[in-house]
Design a protein with these regions (language model features):
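An exposed, glycine/acidic-rich loop-and-rim segment of catalytic or binding clefts
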Residues: 1-333
């Protein structure tokens, strides 16, 4: 494993290059993924420069989202309304990705563990309680890059000092091959159910994918599916898909674009998939891809956002923990 450290604007970037051909570039800021390359070809949609990556406050490219990822009505939690009250967007009355508390710009400590079968980078921090979120969290985000296979595992662990709502995920955007044609990618998700949303984009209930554009069990072109929701407030795909199997041994998410294939397996309940519906004018990317709708998709491992109280609450004896395995290949492999 070849490991390199570089600096930009006082921030550290760690590049791990596996003999398998997979390279993972990480940063302690947001315990995030700066870039993923396979045989030197970009697999992610990443800002053109390190400085752009560090200062982006819109898309959170590859960074950790927490303490609560997703949309929450008025920032309140059932049963804990008087204690936990996250910042709210005054225009919508909704909390998105914890707003100003978001971990995407928290600086984590890190250590590198080199082993025979691969290298692990562990980002960790004790994040103190505050008025809006009165719980202290011990957070650990780890990436394990295999020495022999083009794959890496992302693990999230968070232990609160009291009962608290927790929901951590990663906001990486996939653009396999770094081409404009990525919107032609085929997406397959082995999920029988998906989340429906209200006019404020808050999750309502689980519904069957049967007979809907969101039935991706056999695979469909991303653009074709996203265009079905273009006239809605979602603007495209922005849905939680409940996977049929929660296991690292059984991938449930498959993205194919050009010569490349990404398969993902997770212990989380669902994937939140977003088809880059609202590009920001002037955005530039390291791969040179054109800034346009549908050029990338996310695959955020998430919890059950329709039953927030039961699934979001964790404790010292019952910490938050998810694992997700990302594996890359070419069609020839």
């Amino acid at each position: 494993m070849k490991i390199q450290k570089t600096e930009c604007a006082g921030e550290t970037f760690l590049s791990l290059a596996s003999p398998s051909g997979l390279t993972l570039v990480l940063t302690p800021l947001g315990a995030g993924i700066r870039e993923v390359l396979y045989h030197g070809v970009p697999m992610t949609l990443s800002p053109a420069t390190d400085a752009d990556y560090l200062h982006d406050h819109v898309f959170f490219y590859g960074k950790t989202i927490g303490p609560i990822a997703g949309r929450i009505d008025r920032g309140r939690f059932p049963g804990l309304e008087s204690e936990f009250a996250l910042p709210v967007n005054p225009k919508t009355g909704v909390t998105l990705h914890s707003e100003s508390l978001d971990y995407a710009f928290h600086r984590f400590g890190f250590k590198i563990e080199e082993k025979e079968d691969g290298t692990r980078v562990v980002f960790s921090s004790v994040i103190p309680a505050c008025l809006e979120y009165p719980a202290t969290l011990e957070v650990e985000v780890s990436y394990f890059l295999s020495e022999t296979e083009p794959a890496f595992t992302l693990s999230y662990f968070a232990r609160p000092n009291r009962v608290a709502p927790i929901h951590l995920t990663n906001h990486v955007y996939w653009n396999l091959g770094g081409k404009d044609e990525a919107k032609e990618a085929t997406l397959q998700i082995l999920a029988d159910r998906v989340v429906s949303y209200d006019e404020r984009l808050l999750p309502k209930e689980k519904v069957s994918v049967e007979g809907s554009p969101l039935d991706l069990r056999e695979g469909k072109k991303v653009e074709d599916v996203a265009d079905c929701f273009d006239a809605t407030p979602l603007g495209g795909i922005d849905h939680g898909f409940y996977v049929n199997e929660r296991s690292l041994a059984h991938p449930t998410y498959f993205l194919t674009s050009g010569d490349f294939v990404l398969s993902i397996a997770t212990t989380a309940k669902a994937f939140q998939v977003y088809s880059y519906n609202f590009p920001v004018e002037g955005s530039r990317f390291s791969s040179g891809v054109t800034n346009a709708k549908r050029i990338a998709v996310t695959s955020e491992p998430v919890l059950d956002s329709t039953t927030m109280k039961e699934d979001f609450l964790f404790s010292p004896a019952h910490p938050f923990h998810t694992e997700t395995l990302f594996r890359f290949a070419t069609k020839k492999e």
